């Protein structure tokens, strides 16, 4: 984990919202093609619709979260799915307790 990258990724309200939505995706999204959103994740088109932004902006936000290690990706066919990396998020919490 690179704390600076994590905090940069978290410095945007929409990216924070994405992380919140991915915590309990069934509350915020309709399953895409029968995909288990907890196990596999949420498709970029679902995030795009929820953000009410362009797909390129949503993809950029997801990419930033992914590079920071906050989310994982899984490719199934032509779709990429995103879900939270709960282990990294726990590490961030521990880091904050110890370092700040």
Residue spans of the language-model regions?
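Histidine-centered divalent metal-coordination motifs
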Residues: 15, 60-61
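Short, charged/polar, Gly/Pro-enriched secondary-structure boundary elements
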Residues: 88-92
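Beta-hairpin "wing" of winged helix-turn-helix
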Residues: 67-76, 83
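A common structural junction motif
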Residues: 99-100
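Residue-level signal for well-ordered alpha-helical positions
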Residues: 95-96
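Short, Lys/Arg-enriched N-terminal segment that forms or immediately precedes the first helix
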Residues: 1-7
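N-terminal helix-turn-helix DNA-binding core of bacterial DNA-binding proteins
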Residues: 8, 14-54, 80-87
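Alpha-helical residues within the helix-turn-helix
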Residues: 49, 60, 66-67
């Amino acid at each position: 984990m690179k704390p600076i990258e994590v905090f940069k990724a978290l410095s945007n309200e929409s990216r924070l919202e994405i992380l919140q939505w991915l915590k309990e995706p069934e509350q915020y999204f309709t399953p895409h093609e029968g995909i288990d959103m907890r196990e596999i994740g949420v498709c970029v088109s679902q995030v795009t619709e929820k953000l009410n932004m362009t797909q390129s902006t949503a993809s950029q936000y997801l990419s930033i979260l992914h590079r920071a290690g906050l989310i994982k990706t899984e490719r199934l066919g032509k779709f990429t799915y995103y879900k939270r990396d709960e282990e990294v998020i726990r590490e961030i919490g521990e880091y904050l307790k110890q370092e700040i």
